[in-house]
Regions:
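Short, small-residue-biased leader/transition segments that mark boundaries at the very start
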Residues: 1-5
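Sec-dependent signal peptide cleavage junction
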Residues: 6-13, 18
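Extracytoplasmic small-molecule ligand-binding "clamshell" domains
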Residues: 15-21, 25-95
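Short capping/connector residues at structural and topological boundaries
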Residues: 45-48, 111-113, 117
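Ligand-binding "clamshell"
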Residues: 100-115
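A bilobed periplasmic-binding-protein/Venus flytrap-type ligand-binding module shared by bacterial periplasmic
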Residues: 118-123
Length: 123
């Protein structure tokens, strides 16, 4: 399901609605809070009053599968790790890179996206 969600934001399928919650989801397990910094389109960004993007859709799909409501908290990027560590948020999703320092304080999922940055010059 992750590839389908990501592909709806990147590539020739971009712009299509990638994920919609089923109407019959039992959300009796409560609410999970996702900490993010909604400034990294297409992973998480503002669309009106909503925070949307690849990470938001993956988080919603997980909550649907586990029976939780999803609450997304937008914050400064440097506040995400402390929010998870303190229990203010249940998890963080914000285009985060795995580092040894971060691995010492939180657990990471498997990688679901790889990015390559480049520098451009005049021809």
């Amino acid at each position: 399901r992750q590839m389908c969600i990501r592909d709806s934001y990147i590539g020739e399928d971009a712009g299509k609605t990638p994920y919609e919650s089923p109407e019959d989801v039992d959300r009796s397990n409560g609410t999970l809070v996702m900490a993010t910094n909604a400034e990294f389109e297409p992973y998480e960004y503002h669309e009106g009053d909503d925070i949307v993007g690849i990470d938001a859709d993956i988080a919603q799909a997980i909550c649907d599968k586990l029976g939780y409501e999803l609450k997304i908290e937008d914050m400064e990027f440097d506040s995400i790790l402390p929010a998870v560590q303190s229990g203010k948020a249940d998890f963080g999703a914000a285009g985060m890179t795995v580092t040894e320092d971060r691995k010492s304080s939180v657990d990471f999922t498997d990688t679901y996206a790889d990015a390559s940055q480049v520098i451009i010059v005049k021809k």
